[in-house]
């Protein structure tokens, strides 16, 4: 078909047996170019076969006419079936080694085996690579298969499944694999998942031709700078930075493969195969004690993280029996830590949903989603109809819970403390986070802070320094308390008690704040207040110095105070414009 021998290894050539993945390509009669991933057929290399077949959409299934259907043929068909390939053709090879009756018998057997699978209607073409018989017919069948196959999805979230990595002297690290989901361009920055290493694409090739942009679905070789070969392995994913969220726990529906001869129990030891990756896996059933032919919802814990997307298909093999036992579809690549009693209902909704519905479902499940999470979990940047708040997408329910919690806390605080300006910002944020947690929604501290800030910006609550209050609230100081406070400060001047000392003396913080707001006291520093009359005395002293100016030390001496008060007092006058500073001297405004 291609004129290319995909067997690279010396052992493969010596034994006439495919051991590792091989690659070839050709131009079809229609002019379309197609790439092949040659996967091992021997039963000992099924794991390698899975790493190559995972990302592909179309299958050329090979059965030798002289050897007939084999156990590995059955397992390969089961794998192809559960992966849901979008088209296929069957090559009945070695036609030259059998007579016509044997060829017809082999074809009937193959057709019977394909019944009820995704390849049930695939054309079967008898052919021989030795004589050339049927090769043109096989090429035409492949061309027809490609022409009717659905166009590959092309979004803006590329994902290249790495199935080979090597180094070239003078060029650096090269990764090859099947590209899906979006385009990659030479020169752009990329990330290798799940490890997180960043690199830059030096150059791209497909079918040994240099290209500037690679499109899905195609075989791509990416020459990378900034990352060494030892940092990459088969099963990794090459994508754009931040586009993917590696996971070691997923929720899915799995179904036993056709013809499984024993019950499928979650208690076995399994290997999980998706894309080009393989992981050990543990399975937990949600809605049944065993897995029936109709399948079951499951939670799968992987031995280490990998990159998975909603609707990705995967294969499960039972380690002890060394056989493929099930296939599945990823429904949630990043499920809640605690599934809860509604897990089945949630997964049923996800199973019915299209890809475009996933962002809204994610928001409904979590109540709030970070913008960065939305991109890496769904591939979308927006949630139609949802509200965006400081880097978060939030649901109406979360907005309502948070607003009610803030208003209830402030109302109770104002009722209990009428003289108080308000409640501490941190206290309101904690109340919002606690309310979200009790309601089963996300209770991230950053989310609570963002919502509280948004409530302030929207006018639902008001801010005064480090305090929050309802817009209608006005602090009410007990009659006579303000006069008693100002008298205490005046009596202590020129070295009055600090704010901390006043509070220890029985004056409420709210009373002191009220005095400052009303102008009964002047705050010259966070812990120092003075009477307006004392401040005006200082201004008069500076004014008396006229054009000669006056030092802080002279002001301190004339006031009879200490540097503890004189320095912040003069800095306060500078800030308010009553004085100006030139070197060590102060001058009254206008002099």
Each model region followed by its residue ranges:
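Conserved Switch II/interswitch segment of TRAFAC-class P-loop GTPases
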Residues: 32-34, 39-44, 53-105
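Conserved nucleotide-binding/hydrolysis micro-motifs of P-loop NTPases
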Residues: 42-43, 65-70, 85, 94-99, ...
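P-loop NTPase switch module centered on the Walker A-proximal segment
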Residues: 1-47, 56-63
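Conserved catalytic-core segments of large NTP-driven translation/proteostasis enzymes
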Residues: 95, 101, 112-260
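C-terminal effector modules of nucleic-acid-centric enzymes and ribosome-associated factors
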Residues: 97-103, 109-112, 124, 227-523, ...
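Alpha-helical scaffold elements adjacent to nucleotide-binding pockets in ATP/GTP-utilizing enzyme cores
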Residues: 48, 72-79, 105-113, 137-145
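Residue-level signature of catalytic and energy-coupling elements of molecular machines
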Residues: 1, 16, 38, 49, ...
């Amino acid at each position: 078909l291609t004129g290319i021998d995909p067997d690279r290894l010396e052992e493969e050539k010596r034994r006439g047996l495919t051991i590792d993945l091989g690659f070839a390509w050709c131009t079809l009669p229609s002019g379309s170019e197609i790439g092949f991933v040659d996967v091992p057929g021997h039963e000992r290399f099924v794991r390698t076969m899975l790493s190559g077949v995972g990302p592909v959409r179309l299958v050329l299934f090979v059965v030798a006419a002289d050897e007939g259907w084999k156990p590995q043929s059955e397992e390969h068909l089961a794998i192809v079936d559960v992966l849901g390939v979008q088209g296929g053709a069957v090559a009945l090879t070695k036609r030259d080694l059998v007579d016509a009756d044997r060829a017809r018998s082999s074809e009937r057997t193959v057709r019977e085996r394909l019944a009820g699978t995704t390849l049930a209607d695939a054309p079967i073409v008898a052919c021989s690579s030795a004589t050339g018989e049927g090769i043109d017919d096989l090429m035409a069948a492949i061309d027809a298969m490609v022409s009717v196959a659905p166009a590959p999805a092309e979004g803006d979230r590329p994902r290249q499944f790495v199935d080979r990595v090597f180094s070239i002297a003078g060029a650096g690290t090269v990764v090859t694999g099947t590209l899906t989901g979006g385009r990659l361009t030479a020169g752009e920055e990329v990330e290798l998942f799940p490890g997180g290493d960043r690199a830059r694409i030096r150059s791209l090739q497909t079918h040994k031709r240099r290209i500037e942009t690679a499109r899905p679905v195609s075989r791509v070789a990416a020459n990378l700078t900034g990352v060494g070969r030892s940092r990459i392995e088969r099963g990794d994913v090459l994508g754009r930075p931040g586009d993917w969220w590696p996971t070691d726990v997923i929720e899915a529906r799995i179904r036993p493969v056709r013809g499984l001869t024993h019950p499928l129990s979650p208690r076995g030891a399994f290997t999980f195969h998706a894309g080009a990756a393989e992981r050990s896996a543990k399975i937990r059933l949600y809605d049944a004690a065993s897995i029936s032919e109709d399948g079951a919802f499951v939670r799968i814990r992987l031995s280490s993280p990998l990159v998975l997307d909603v609707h990705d298909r995967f294969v499960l093999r039972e380690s002890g029996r060394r056989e493929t036992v099930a296939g599945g579809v990823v429904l949630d690549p990043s499920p809640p830590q605690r599934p809860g009693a509604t897990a089945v209902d949630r997964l049923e909704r996800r199973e019915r949903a299209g890809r475009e519905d996933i962002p809204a479902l994610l928001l409904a499940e979590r109540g709030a989603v970070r913008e960065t999470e939305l991109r890496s979990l769904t591939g979308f940047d927006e949630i139609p109809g949802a509200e965006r708040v400081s880097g978060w997408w939030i649901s109406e329910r979360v907005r309502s819970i948070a607003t009610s919690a803030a208003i209830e806390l402030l109302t109770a605080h104002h009722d209990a403390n009428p003289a108080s300006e308000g409640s501490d910002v941190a206290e309101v944020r904690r109340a919002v986070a606690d309310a979200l947690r009790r309601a089963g929604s996300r209770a991230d501290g950053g989310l609570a802070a963002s919502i509280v800030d948004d409530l302030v910006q929207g006018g639902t609550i008001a801010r005064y320094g480090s305090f929050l209050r309802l817009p209608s609230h006005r602090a009410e100081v007990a009659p006579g308390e303000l006069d008693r406070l100002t008298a205490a400060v005046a009596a202590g001047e020129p070295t009055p008690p600090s704010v901390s000392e006043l509070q220890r003396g029985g004056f409420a913080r709210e009373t002191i704040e009220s005095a400052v707001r009303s102008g009964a006291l002047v705050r010259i520093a966070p812990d120092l207040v003075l009477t307006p009359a004392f401040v005006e005395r200082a201004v008069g002293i500076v004014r008396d110095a006229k054009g000669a100016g006056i030092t802080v030390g002279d002001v301190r001496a004339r006031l009879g105070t200490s540097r503890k008060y004189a320095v912040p007092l003069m800095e306060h006058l500078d800030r308010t414009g009553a004085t100006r500073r030139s070197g060590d001297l102060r001058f009254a405004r206008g002099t």
